Regions:
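Positively charged, small/polar-rich N-terminal and surface patches that mediate targeting and assembly
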Residues: 1-109
Length: 109
């Protein structure tokens, strides 16, 4: 199993979740997060924002093919414009060693 973590613009979350659901990936965890990338924040007038609001989506997939599908959906849907822009986000993929259902205490992987 693999965990796909995507940090994206808040205004793109609805579209990404809808596309994931349509493609057969209904199980998603969403979290509000704050951070910055290469640009180290932004300046608007006299105000400097060093941490920007983002959303993190966590999707656990069973295999490489599903991982590739999820990444393709997120990339296509979360990108700003045809070429993308600073602040569109990042996607991280990591292995999931094991998982447990809290209510039953059973291992689910």
């Amino acid at each position: 199993m693999l965990m796909v973590r995507a940090i994206i613009r808040p205004e793109k979350v609805g579209a990404v979740l809808s596309e994931l659901l349509s493609a057969g990936f209904p199980e998603v965890t969403k979290m509000d997060v704050f951070g910055r990338g290469k640009q180290k924040g932004i300046k608007v007038g006299d105000i400097y924002y060093d941490e920007l609001p983002k959303e993190m989506l966590l999707v656990v997939v069973k295999n490489e093919a599903d991982k590739d599908d999820v990444i393709r959906i997120i990339m296509r849907t979360a990108r700003t414009g045809e070429k993308g822009a600073f602040g569109d986000g990042k996607i991280f993929v990591s292995p999931v060693e094991t998982a447990y259902t809290i209510s039953s205490g059973k291992e689910v992987l």
